[in-house]
Amino acid sequence: FEIIEIGAVKLDENLKEIDRFSRTIRPKVYKKLHYITRDLTGITQEELCASDPFSYVLVDFMLWCGKDYIFCTWGNMDLVELQRNMKYYGLLDLLKGPVKYYNVQKFFRLLCAHDASAVSLESAVDYFQLPKEAGFHRAVNDAAYTADVFRRIDQEEAKKLYSIDYYQNPQNKGDEINLRYDSYYK
């Protein structure tokens, strides 16, 4: 549940990287870093203890995003977890939902791998033979790899497959969003 790091890469309209955001977060609920998380990410307990709390980092992140943005994620859970944490800290009003986003994992599965099963980010990086210059499982590194994969996917086709995160459900019938894709409707 508890987010301990936010990392993102900002792309311009030509998909050129123009900025990065990377911050660790001092945990409030699970104050002791689990050894598996430590081993997977390389984040240390000392680093987390010296970090700002979620509310500070989130406000900085949303300011960094600006007004005109769309999230690109690897999978469909990043926005759910972000909003769960925002709700816990009373900050959900900073992100109006339902949220439109690009699920790059879905794009890769449908447009490149032609497979219905989930695929790891590292597998997609390998598929495109991208250089592995940084470790996986750090937020900003994974964001950079996701952006690299996104750049190599047919943008016109991908943008037809955008996703809507429904963590925040429409409040009335007029706010409902209905999507029709080539192979399904929601």
Could you tell me what each predicted segment is?
Residues A147-K186:
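Acidic two-metal-ion nuclease catalytic site recognized across multiple nuclease folds
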Residues A139-V149:
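Alpha-helical transmembrane segments that form the membrane-embedded catalytic/substrate-binding core
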Residues Y69-T73, L92, K132-H137:
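Short helix-to-loop capping/linker segments positioned immediately adjacent to catalytic or ligand/cofactor-binding
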